[in-house]
Amino acid sequence: VGDKMKHYKLNQLFADEASSLEIPQFMLETGRSLFSEHVQQPLSKENLYAGFSLLDKDTVIDFDSVDSEIARIDIDDSDAMPKAWKLQGFDNQNVKKWFDEQPSDRKMRLCKDIIIKKLSNNNAVNDRDLDIYVDRIIQNLTEDQLTDMEQTPGIYALKINKKVNSLLNEYAKKMFYEWVEQDKISCLPSYKLPREISPTNTIASIPKSLYSEEENFDTEYERKVVMELSSLNNVRWWHRNIARKGFSINGAINAYPDLMVKTESGKLLLIETKGDQLENLESKEKAEMGAKWAEMAG
């Protein structure tokens, strides 16, 4: 597949300066080496999850909204399994029929097994802790909720997984700011722009692009922003950052800015073009992390 992908190189006008650019990222001090008293590596979520335990965490989950959750949840279209079976947690109708014929106590154990299986691929959570945590959740369910869970253990697994992820994110945020205060985390030049990129959908009609072609825009608003920026005399080049592949502000939550803009005065601007209509808790947390990055990067 890689050989068939088109590669777009840095524009020759900007290639030298872009190749020498190192963008600050959060770095974690990991100890000493033979050659230095300070050894650092790029901070990862896995670093921040160290020491996390579910044993002391709350089990407050809104299961009353299961019906609306089923109505709105999106399953990956590439999965051949029908959506209804994915939500129920069964592979097919025969398995569901067999499940319905089981006695109530066995159904409960099977539901728990389905939930544990769906959550057990999270390496940040201890399997034994997870088993105990799911037991605590099930013990607090009402009779109606237990009946619902028997019908759709898949959706209960999704809601529990969402809760576990929110607990992990809270813990990671707490550890991040603690380690910043303890000077375990710094913000140092680290990320280098690649010499070429390989977006699947590109645009080449806007001047001052860093690469010969850039990844195309998600919205018309984003395109207008870039058109305006490229027309400014003090803008040297712009680049559309490729989400999950390009530069990220690697804090307690990873933030991929939509655009990078280099000014003629040498400043590098990281720009998020999402409109107010998309503002939510996650985008606010990303904005906070971006502000902390800017403060520490200097």
Feature-to-residue mapping (PLM):
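Catalytic core segments in nucleotide and nucleic-acid processing enzymes
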Residues: 275
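Catalytic cores and motor modules of nucleic-acid processing enzymes
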Residues: 1-256, 261-269, 278, 282-288, ...
